[in-house]
Amino acid sequence: TEPHVASSADYINILLVGQAAREGEAERFADTMILCTVNTYEKTVTLTSLLRDTLVQYPNYTDTNGKKHSGGKIKLTSIYHNGYICTNSTADAMGLMNQTLYSNFGIEVDYDVEIDFDAFIKAINLLGGINVELTAAEANYLNDFHDRYYYEVKEGKNWLDGSTALAYVRMRKAEGDGESDIKRTARQRQFMEALLAKVKKMSLSDVQNLANEVLPLVSVSMTNSQITDLLMKMLPMLSGLEIKSSGTCPVRARGYSWGDMVDIYGDGQIHSVMLYDKDKNVAYMRALTEGEGEIPETVPIQD
């Protein structure tokens, strides 16, 4: 028989959005966007950070009430907000996100998971906290929040509770971070790797119990039967699951730099954005998320 080669049927793409609002706040923006690509054949999960300052073209959109909205250019972080205000619903926020990711990068999102700050804190505490390796600069930054988070951290491995973990994944101004989002998103992937590594070591019954406690805290674009189906696919993989980080999307090709100054709306106001080579990024992401050809190694680069 022919050896099995991973095809699009083996891939599940889950978009995780950390939504920047607390209970009672009306504004909705995507503070964090991570694509989790599950390869059920190779038993891998690959994490890709979506850079929030990327300048994207979002499509004309029909919301869940049937009303039509015109597309345009905007930073990726604002796509969630633009979709949300159509009907004040997560469904339209994630719907516009999914359409934008497909039209700009060729990413086909299968499922969406949205979590806000308060739910993130609760979920991490339910998991019993996460152990994360901190640099001296990161520890110093977090210790500025000492009165708020009640305990100090140090350089090296530290246990983070939900509140401190939230400060860690949102950190942007630690010494050496610079102006870009690269180090911040790298921290978020490191945190997700540590979280998944902890879940890997849990018994199947404990994972199921954890899922039952966490799912009510988040918004998901799945029916109960789809959630059950996904768990049935994922649980047998856990013990041998390999967790990978692919870096960011977009990946910067030569000739593109961070912090391009662009008049997005033609109103004379200049905004710092991330520009990218669309064709090269689509080819890269299709290979990474759908198994279409070999993943290019020399075209997209991380500076």
Per-segment meaning from a language model:
Residues 1-303:
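Non-catalytic, solvent-exposed segments at the cell envelope interface
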